[in-house]
UniProtKB/Swiss-Prot annotation:
Keywords, in A-Z order: Cytoplasm, Nucleus, tRNA processing
Entry's Gene Ontology molecular function annotations: protein kinase binding
Name this polypeptide is given: EKC/KEOPS complex subunit Tprkb
Keyword Zinc-finger: no
InterPro entries: CGI121/TPRKB (IPR013926), CGI121/TPRKB_sf (IPR036504)
Pfam families, per the entry: CGI-121 (PF08617)
Upper taxonomic lineage: Eukaryota, Metazoa, Chordata, Craniata, Vertebrata
Family membership noted in the UniProt record: Belongs to the CGI121/TPRKB family.
Record's keyword annotation contains RNA-binding: no
Length: 158
């Protein structure tokens, strides 16, 4: 149902990915994330082709966090920002973060040593169905990926 990966460069850190579909409260989740009451990144699953994208973005975010050189204020936002091919934070949040209309949401959180995330509490806030991460290809919309990443059709393949 989920993917949890220990980061090679930071073995004390684990990244967990949770995928949801048929989400009915994306607007509420977004609001909670902006208030800081959700401990994780809320990502538009329609624009993610492979979980590896998330792991790369999370690894970079943790690295910059440890160096004190993040470009955003929170680790969760830094992960979303690192998914973007450009350097505009607000544009990255619009394209890769969730919006009120999203029905597929990927939640990503980082646990660092003693800092644990209460996954049950996080999952209970989502009004939708948690699905295995292997379902991501069915959720990905390649037309949206091409649009947000400014790619040509032949550049996006599975």
């Amino acid at each position: 149902m989920q993917l949890t990966q220990q980061l090679d460069l930071f073995p004390e850190c684990k990244v967990t990915l949770l995928l949801f579909k048929d989400v009915k409260n994306a607007g509420d989740l977004r609001k909670k994330a902006m208030e800081g009451s959700i401990d994780g990144s809320l990502i538009n699953a329609n624009v993610i082709v492979d979980p590896f994208q998330i792991l790369v973005a999370a690894n970079k975010a943790v690295h910059l966090h440890k160096l004190g050189k993040m470009k955003t204020r929170t680790l969760s936002t830094e992960i979303i920002f690192n998914l973007s091919p450009n350097n505009n934070i607000s544009e990255a949040l619009k394209k890769f973060g969730i919006s009120e209309s999203n029905t597929s949401v990927l939640i990503v959180y980082v646990e660092d040593g003693d800092k644990q995330v209460h996954q049950e509490h996080l999952v209970s806030q989502v009004e939708g169905q948690q699905v295995p991460l292997e379902s991501l290809p069915e959720i990905t919309r390649l037309s949206e990926v091409r649009k947000v990443c400014s790619t040509q059709p032949e550049e996006v393949s599975r």
